[in-house]
Swiss-Prot record:
Mg(2+) 1 binds at D55, D128. The gene is thiL. Belongs to the thiamine-monophosphate kinase family. It comes from the Archaea. It catalyses: thiamine phosphate + ATP = thiamine diphosphate + ADP. This is Thiamine-monophosphate kinase. It comes from Methanopyrus kandleri (strain AV19 / DSM 6324 / JCM 9639 / NBRC 100938). Pathway: Cofactor biosynthesis; thiamine diphosphate biosynthesis; thiamine diphosphate from thiamine phosphate: step 1/1.
Length: 309
């Protein structure tokens, strides 16, 4: 999840502070014109259907030393492209600026960026390069929307809540390395080489489906709360239905936590969270993890018998 303005790192900002900062910026600046304005959703949508997204990474906040430069390049592209797909846009063009530090292997970083662009069918249109004390990557992706945007305000009571794939791997990887563990290579791959299901968003919009969609970059719980708030509904998440990445259970056992909690509270999964009619789940092979009801907020249901009637 993002917006026309990206939220600061969740490691240093609480959700309320993030929302207040975005509101401050949006209220202070002119925002007239777009169909979907800055701060309203995952990305901005211009009158002609162009979808625009911005994202940034810094070494100190987003890049653990275990992340290889080539994989950093890929991850950077994926993180920028993901929000365009979540809005229903087909990513087309990419520009980026980079502040290079003394640690980065520039050739490997560029190789990873190139691989990411080719993977998602995106062409480079320009950028800027400077040198500095810290590695900073800032990217912009433009895509084309064929249909209506997949707004986070589209959820309705009676909808199913679904995800495009398993979760928790990136969170388990980070927790493991911060505590001196050597996680499985599969967890590294999930953290370093995310593959957001852009084609799902594109086909949802092209097919005229009504769905609320966001990418899971800040964690399943946080993204569900964002959809519930923007749609004016309540969301139930049934934990026994949440798919968990391979290797998460081993890390969870080490820290005596429920593997599902690593999926709920993690981030950087870059799968899509989708709320929509039952036919959306069937058509796109999604995994149902809950339902949308009347009310507000998010309810975590851990016992099947505790479901709201």
């Amino acid at each position: 999840m993002s917006s026309g303005f990206k939220r600061p790192s969740p490691r240093t900002w609480r959700p309320k502070e993030e929302e207040e900062l975005i509101e401050l910026i949006v209220e202070a600046c002119p925002t007239e014109g777009p169909r979907v304005k800055a701060g309203d959703d995952d990305a901005a949508v211009l009158p002609d259907g162009t979808v625009v997204n911005f994202d940034a990474m810094t070494r100190s906040r987003h890049v653990p030393k275990e992340l290889r430069d080539r994989d950093l390049g890929w991850k950077f592209v994926a993180s920028v492209v993901s929000d365009v797909g979540a809005m229903g846009g087909e990513p087309s063009f990419f520009g980026f600026s980079v502040c290079l530090d003394d640690e980065v292997d520039v050739e490997q970083l560029v190789l990873g960026i190139s691989e990411g662009l080719r993977e998602f069918g995106v062409s480079l249109i320009g950028g800027d390069v400077v040198e500095g004390e810290e590695l900073v990557l800032s990217g912009t992706c433009l895509g084309k929307l064929k249909g209506e945007p997949l707004l986070m305000s589209n959820a309705r009571p009676g909808d199913v809540v679904a995800v495009t794939g398993p979760l928790g791997g990136p969170n388990a990887f980070v927790r493991a390395i911060l505590n001196g563990m050597e996680p499985e290579e599969t967890l590294y791959e999930r953290f370093a080489r995310p593959r957001p299901p852009v084609e799902v968003g594109v086909e949802l919009a092209r097919g005229g489906y009504r769905a609320a969609v966001t990418d899971i970059s800040d964690g399943l719980l946080a993204e569900a709360e964002a959809i519930a708030r923007r749609s004016g509904v309540a969301i139930e998440i049934h934990t026994w239905k949440v798919p968990v990445d391979e290797g998460v259970e081993e890390v969870a056992q080490e820290f005596d936590v429920d593997p599902v909690d690593l999926a709920l509270e993690g981030g950087e999964d870059y799968e899509f969270l989708i709320c929509g009619p039952e036919d959306v789940v069937k058509e796109f092979g999604l995994t149902t993890i809950g339902r949308v009801t009347e009310g507000e907020g998010v309810r975590i249901v851990r016992n099947p018998r505790a479901r709201s009637e």
